[in-house]
Structure formats: C-alpha cells, structure tokens
Regions:
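Cross-kingdom leucine-rich repeat
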Residues: 1-251
C-alpha cells in the first residue's frame, strides 16, 4: 500500500508553511497513492489543486484513482479539499473513507462535480469544523444537478459542528440505499438533512452519541433531524427559564 503520512514525502522541506499540498504538476505523478494522513499544517489552504490542470483537448484528466483513504486533522487555514478543475476530470473513484477533523476555515466538503466522482465513498466523518455550513454545496450555473450521489455511503458522523445547517441545500431527490449509521452529535443549528424527500431504506435511527446507545427515529431522516433540533431548543429554553427563576428568587 502506498501512503503519504506527512507532506515531506513529497520533498517539501517545511510542511507547516505550504499552502497547496498537491499542485497540478504533482497530482499526475501520484497514480499509486492509496492513503493520505495529513496533520498540523498551519498554513495549508488547498489539498488538491485541480484548478490549473491542463490537458490536451482529446484527453480526459484522471487523478488519484487508487486513493482509498483521506484523513485530515487540524488544518486551521484549509479552505478547499478539492479546488475546482476541468469539467472532463476523472479520478478519486476508489476513495472509501474521508475523515475531516479540526479544519476551522472549511465551509463545505464537496461540490457536486467532485461528489459525482466519489462513486465508492463509504464513510464520511466531520468533527470540530467551526465554519462548515453544508457538506455538499449547491451546483454552480455551469454544473449539472447530480442526483445519483453517495450511493455507497453507509456511515456518516457529524460532530461538534456549530454552524452546520444541512447536508445540502439543493432540493434534489437524494437516495441513500446503503446508509446504515448516522450520528449527529452537538450540531445545534442542524435543522434538516436536505430540503427534499429522500430515501434511506437501511437507516433505522439517528444516534446522538458515539457509543451508539441513544437513537431517534421519526419515520424519515429529515423529520428525525428536525425532532432532534426542536428537542435541543426546548432543553435550552427550560434551562434559561430555570436560571431566570433562580435569579428572581435570589433578588
């Protein structure tokens, strides 16, 4: 298995100061890379710089087809995992696991054009990313709406994401035929999963703890997320009322 555990494996002298881990001239050389574990690069802004990839008109870009795992930890300046590339791009078709932890400048994970490449993605974990508002952003005008996304995803963990509002704000009819585990832990602004009907035939509940002890289910994923959100709001209101009563008693 070919792994990259530290960016110094790419002949980078000071990994804490790099801004783009895989610029265009390097990406094409990493055909056998299977696993990436990246941690504590304080100035890194982009993982995969696809924006400046140049190919002949007759060619189709194919990048990192063997990559199976991508683990990103404590990258405070990271703004893009994938920065947009040519429409004809192919790649990342074997990625199974995506872990993102402590990336406080990220506002989203995927664009639709990238998500459609991730046909084998099985597990998504997003933890302690303060600015993330959506996992999948809306399609740009030049992008086609994609409905057949995330068919292999069987596990999603969303944890300690204070600004997360939804998985996606696009009213697509998403289907999740493989989704079995869904964990939502301390995401106080998550009011819905997607603004449309969705099918999750294998999902039986949404867990609110990492040990899989407590789950909720209200018939579908959107209704369950909404129920959890309302429950959190109700608990906060009760706590505020209790504090006010204690204050008035003291006065």
């Amino acid at each position: 298995m070919t792994k990259l555990k530290d960016p110094r494996a790419s002949d980078i002298d000071n990994p804490s100061k790099i801004q783009s881990l895989f610029p265009p001239h390097i990406i094409g050389r990493l055909k056998n890379l299977e696993s990436i574990v990246l941690q504590d690069c304080q100035l890194l802004e982009v993982i995969f710089q696809l924006e400046e990839l140049n190919f002949e008109e007759s060619q189709v870009a194919s990048v990192l087809d063997q990559l199976r795992e991508l683990n990103l930890y404590n990258l405070p300046k990271l703004m893009h995992i994938w920065k947009k590339g040519p429409e004809r791009i192919r790649g990342f078709g074997n990625l199974r696991l995506l872990v993102v932890w402590g990336c406080n400048s990220l506002t989203y994970l995927f664009s639709p054009s990238i998500a459609k490449l991730l046909v084998m993605l099985e597990e998504i974990q997003v933890t302690k990313c303060k600015k993330i508002e959506e996992i999948l952003i809306r399609a740009r005008e030049e992008e086609k709406e994609e409905k057949n996304l995330f068919h292999k995803v069987n596990s999603i963990l969303l944890r300690d994401l204070p600004n997360l509002k939804c998985f996606c704000n696009e009213a697509n009819a998403f289907e999740w035929p493989s989704l079995k585990k869904m964990m939502v832990i301390r995401c106080p602004n998550l009011r819905m999963f997607v603004p449309s009907n969705l099918k999750t035939p294998e999902l039986e509940g949404v867990y609110e703890d990492i040990e899989f002890k407590t789950s909720q289910w209200k018939g579908d994923l959107n209704a369950t997320i909404e129920h959890i959100f309302k429950g959190k709001v109700w608990h906060i209101l009760i706590a505020i009322i209790s504090l006010m009563e204690e204050f008035n008693t003291c006065v």
